[in-house]
Amino acid sequence: MFISISAGIVTFLLTLVEIPAFIQFYRKAQITGQQMHEDVKQHQAKAGTPTMGGLVFLITSVLVAFFFALFSSQFSNNVGMILFILVLYGLVGFLDDFLKVFRKINEGLNPKQKLALQLLGGVIFYLFYERGGDILSVFGYPVHLGFFYIFFALFWLVGFSNAVNLTDGVDGLASISVVISLSAYGVIAYVQGQMDILLVILAMIGGLLGFFIFNHKPAKVFMGDVGSLALGGMLAAISMALHQEWTLLIIGIVYVFETTSVMMQVSYFKLTGGKRIFRMTPVHHHFELGGLSGKGNPWSEWKVDFFFWGVGLLASLLTLAILYLM
């Protein structure tokens, strides 16, 4: 436990030092910053804010977790595969950000390219991580999927990777939402005695907390796709490594809600010839523009943050209660 906590503290302190240096480099190099949604007027002032900050906490967390696990004899197959997903999905996000920022390609990687790379990572993860006989845990009950587990694994990894990416649209929202989710999985890992996975979790929590100091409103830096895609893949990988896949539907309710809002909006728009359910999706923008109903007073980014963080925290506590108190 001491090693895991130490990894988190080291990552936190390193990120505190590295992020300001990253921002300074970004400014001096006159790199074009984040582009903003035209429909959210209050975001226009953020245009040009340095992005790709996720590269800093991602590299730092992965290296700290790797070396701490290695030198404490806690490096396992599961740790290796979680770090692999972080690196590969982070690379996908980096390529996406790179094309947007340096090549001026607004959409970055096209959907097919992004999906292909995410699926590749999922296949490799499936082949090497300790699966326990391709058993899917559904509310604590084992379901033997056999070969079909690979399809679930791919759906889980790609789905939650993109879901966290959609959540990253308000200052600080994604970073603390993931901290809350990882904290819940940290408890599960501790109870299961999987200290190797706990080490990786605490290392990333440390990095995210250090990053949040510069990412809360008004954000001085954004994580970019390099951070959000990696974090979503990490959550999915951890849920599978702990054999508690179903828990991510509750622990990750914020990401599920954000993604579902986009799917509902697109489907309803097509079916009705242009009508909308929400003022704007992902749904955090709906709250920004008109509060909970979409027709009231706009919510500040802090209010949106605390609403979603509160939902995520309650969902995480509910999950732990279901697992250990019922």
Swiss-Prot record:
InterPro entries: Glycosyl_transferase_4, PNAcMuramoyl-5peptid_Trfase, PNAcMuramoyl-5peptid_Trfase_CS. GO terms for cellular component: plasma membrane. It is an enzyme of class 2 (transferase). It comes from the Bacteria. Catalyzes the initial step of the lipid cycle reactions in the biosynthesis of the cell wall peptidoglycan: transfers peptidoglycan precursor phospho-MurNAc-pentapeptide from UDP-MurNAc-pentapeptide onto the lipid carrier undecaprenyl phosphate, yielding undecaprenyl-pyrophosphoryl-MurNAc-pentapeptide, known as lipid I. Belongs to the glycosyltransferase 4 family. MraY subfamily. This is Phospho-N-acetylmuramoyl-pentapeptide-transferase. The lineage of its organism: Bacteria, Bacillati, Bacillota, Bacilli, Lactobacillales. The gene is mraY.
